Amino acid sequence: MFGMLSLPTYEAKAVKTRTSLPAQSSNPSTSSCIAYDVITKSITVSCTNPTRLTDVNNALHNSDILAKQSPDGIWFLRANLVISKGAVFHIDSTDTKWLKISSEQAASSSSSSINAASVIPYHIDVHGSLGIHSVKITSWNPTTNNYAITNGSREAVPAGTKGATFNGYIIHLGAPRPFIKVEHDATGTTNITNSEVAYLGYESGSTSNVGSGGLNYYGGNNSIISGNSIHDLYFGFYSSGVSDMVIQYNTVYNNANYGLDPHTGTHDMVIRYNVVHDNGAQGIICSLNCYNILIENNRLYHNEKAGIMFSRNMFNSVARNNIIYNEVDGIIISQSNNNKIYNNTISNPQYGINLIYSSSGNTIYSNIIKNSSKYGIYISQVAQGGNNNNTFYNNQLINSPSNIGSGLHSKPSSDFKNNLSPTNILR
């Protein structure tokens, strides 16, 4: 159990124990705190007592905006749903089985953080508190009478490539699909538990905070995402600047890009007991000034790129007790420092553990790496600077190619001498 471990400060900070609150009864009087704007095509909920789709339906009485399609709680939403600051909204099994959000486009965004002239699909925009429990939420294309499909993509390319964005992507725009976005100013949590979240998000070309990835947290500290099936989104999960979240016991698969992507200053997050597979890029990637992240006891396989990646100044974080197999790279550490990688089992990768782009002060120990087709442990040094002062010990490298020193490889060898402890076990 986590409470029994003796951890360094940054590991202890990352381990959080939380429980979700049970669903509460619907708000008996909501007509004054639910409004519809015909220009932005937005339902705004400002009720401070817990409110649900039934309350919205009773207040608006307009099936062109929100229609209940079956007695057991299948709803079709043709509007933005905006949860105001201080408001509390629940989408749960009290009155909902499946919320289908139309893939039609709103006239403009209702969110101040998005250009008001932008034409974007309907979405859920959270400035208050949202609870999603034991339901299904998807896009829905009323023309095809099926889930909305998008075909956009972004491809990482070397800096300076013609047509690339400033941060090195070639962008192929996708057909717009609805998404869920928790805003920077959210006054409460957005907890998602025991639900299916699918077929949301698209490639909008934005490198900032449009939130079109599918499931996006720019606020909502202390939120929990637990026990869900998250699939066929553009990004399975994306966050920026949030803290104290727990992502656990989810199955995350078939997302067009990353599976789980804590980003840009996300910190004090726990990612544990998830199954992450068959995503279009890394299974779990933490990138750009993320810290105090604990990634443990996850199973990752068949992702298009690495199972786990520490990227662009991720620091004081841990990946431990993960089972990773059939990936190009098991674990990549890139431009990241002072992390711990231990007790992971990596099978059938091309590269087991791969250190690139000036990563220093990392400790990699007690990992089992089996059947690497190229290198068990690979340490590269490039023009930006070397990988220095990393510590490797008690790693087991089993059945890696014999022509590269039983799976250990460094470029150049002088850098490798400073990183490798002689207690690695080679077979």
Predicted regions and their residues:
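Sec-dependent signal peptide cleavage junction
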Residues: G3-K16
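Beta-strand/loop edge motif enriched in small/polar residues
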Residues: V15-E296, Y301-Y325, D329, Q335, ...
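Short, contiguous acidic/charged loop-to-helix segments that flank catalytic cores in large enzymes
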Residues: L355-I356, S380-V382
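Active-site-proximal flexible loops/turns
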Residues: S373, P401
